[in-house]
């Protein structure tokens, strides 16, 4: 088993593709990928480092598999767990709800002890509001828009993975 668990929910395949891009950059020896629809509480509890991928649907709704998993997520003690979030949204058609699900999942795991890393700058995005903000200048995790800015996805993922690798001290952990 790898040291990092990447858990995603996806209806269109976009968030799944992002999860696999992240795994490819980290390496399969560092990160395992899991579909949240096929995951259990014990699956998440097995990792001290979690990357959670959650897309936002329509008017700020979480993807259905994550929505179904939220009661289970609320049972997990996240103390001692390092968590980075990533998610897909549409900043044009749903500008008032862009990547809201990032905030939804943060609001579940942070009070349960999760240490969240991987805040991502809002520069370069064009949206009106988001519950997925950490502050005025940062999302709580990586925000991806495959509908309006697919040409930026690979670069954003690459930079974010480098950022979280440093924040998580992955080199030190792997070389310990």
UniProtKB/Swiss-Prot annotation:
Lineage, broadest ranks: Bacteria, Pseudomonadati, Pseudomonadota, Gammaproteobacteria, Enterobacterales
Keyword Plastid attributed: no
Function of the molecule: Low-potential electron donor to a number of redox enzymes (Potential). Involved in the reactivation of inactive cob(II)alamin in methionine synthase.
UniProt keyword annotation of ATP-binding present: no
Binding positions (FMN): 10-15, 56-60, 90, 94-99, 147
Pfam families for the chain: Flavodoxin_1
Any one GO CC term of the record: cytosol
Molecular-function annotations in GO: electron transfer activity; FMN binding
Residues forming coiled coils: none
Domain of life: Bacteria
Xref: InterPro entries: Flavodoxin, Flavodoxin/NO_synth, Flavodoxin_CS, Flavodoxin_lc, Flavoprotein-like_sf
Domain named Flavodoxin-like: residues: 4-165
Cofactor(s) this protein cannot do without: FMN
Assembly information from the UniProt record: Monomer.
Cofactor stoichiometry and binding remark: Binds 1 FMN non-covalently.
Entry note about domains: The structure is significantly stabilized upon cofactor binding.
Entry keywords, A to Z: Electron transport, Flavoprotein, FMN, Nucleotide-binding, Transport
Signal peptide: none
The protein's name in its UniProt record: Flavodoxin 1
Family stated for the protein in its record: Belongs to the flavodoxin family.
Annotated source species: Escherichia coli (strain K12)
